[in-house]
Amino acid sequence: MNKRFESIGLVGHPRHPAALATHEMLFHWLTGKGYPVIVERQIARDLKLQHALTGTLADIGQQADLAVVVGGDGNMLGAARILARYDVDVIGVNRGNLGFLTDLDPDNAKQQLSCVLEGEYSRERRFLLEVKVCRDGQMHRRSTAINEVVLHPGKVAHMIEFEVYINDTFAFSQRSDGLIISTPTGSTAYSLSAGGPILAPTLDAIALVPMFPHTLSARPLVIDSNSKIHLRFSHFSNELEISCDSQIALPIQQGEEVIVQRSPFYLSLIHPKDYSYFNTLSSKLGWSKKLF
């Protein structure tokens, strides 16, 4: 029997009235059922919830058993990078487009969430990536990503020359527009658009996907998730960047190198009891239906 949730966090950055209305509906419904609810501060201000318990994402991670993220996958990614540092489960209400990470239908959210609160759910642990920008062995900048870490030019598109080492062994060099380093969670995001493979979320694997390589032989490469990926660069005159989930940018300067490896943190993702990963793929990607 799954554990029951005792305290709930409400998270999101609503961009339109419908998403804000979902936050308001969930707040009043959850408090009406007797749950302690901690609301992300900006949402509480937008809804004028003067007497609500409010806090930052870190506060929610420390105090809540379950964080409910209302929005699209972008909202989920932004919240989950922080919430993954804490012992808190996360579930999403889809107010975006595709919604690979946000399972709950906003029109049916109360019924679905009610079943989850009664212990009818499944839990998945999704690993994160950690990226470090280093010089002479010293770490200068770092971040984490749930979907992908992407090497790309800065403001102007141009070819990049770089070498890739895996577990300190030279793997390949490349001239391309960049490189996508994707988790299984991110394999249905940017990586998929670049021709990368879809990795089932239970796989302990990382995909390296070239972006417009200047050779016909370059292909996506799938490696063990415990591998350490080291990117080294020839001299470059234009800016390079590392982006994490298309939300955080780390500049790369001359003489710096990049190390990407599996983070010690996990996103604890909650799904409704009837969730099916392959049904989600089929519906989101428009795959053909069963023939018989």
From Swiss-Prot:
Record-listed NAD(+) binding positions: 73-74, 147-148, 158, 175, 177, 188-193, 247
Active-site residue numbers: 73
What are the subcellular locations of this protein? Cytoplasm
GO CC, one annotated term: cytoplasm
> What Gene Ontology molecular function terms does this protein carry?
ATP binding; metal ion binding; NAD binding; NAD+ kinase activity
Which GO BP terms sit in this record? NAD metabolic process; NADP biosynthetic process
Coiled coil: which residue ranges? none
Name the Enzyme Commission number(s) assigned to this protein.
Answer: 2.7.1.23
Keyword NADP among record annotations? yes
Reaction(s) catalysed (UniProt annotation): NAD(+) + ATP = ADP + NADP(+) + H(+)
Q: What is its main location?
A: cytoplasm
Enzyme class at the top of the EC tree? transferase
UniProt-listed InterPro entries: ATP-NAD_kinase_N, ATP-NAD_kinase_PpnK-typ_C, NAD/diacylglycerol_kinase_sf, NADK
Q: Which UniProt keywords apply?
A: ATP-binding, Cytoplasm, Kinase, NAD, NADP, Nucleotide-binding, Transferase
Q: Which Pfam families match?
A: NAD_kinase, NAD_kinase_C
Per its UniProt record, what Gene3D superfamilies does this chain match? Probable inorganic polyphosphate/atp-NAD kinase, domain 1, Probable inorganic polyphosphate/atp-NAD kinase, domain 2
- This protein's superkingdom? Bacteria
**Cofactor(s) recorded in Swiss-Prot or TrEMBL:** a divalent metal cation
The entry's function note states: Involved in the regulation of the intracellular balance of NAD and NADP, and is a key enzyme in the biosynthesis of NADP. Catalyzes specifically the phosphorylation on 2'-hydroxyl of the adenosine moiety of NAD to yield NADP.
Q: Which family does it belong to?
A: Belongs to the NAD kinase family.
The protein in question is named: NAD kinase
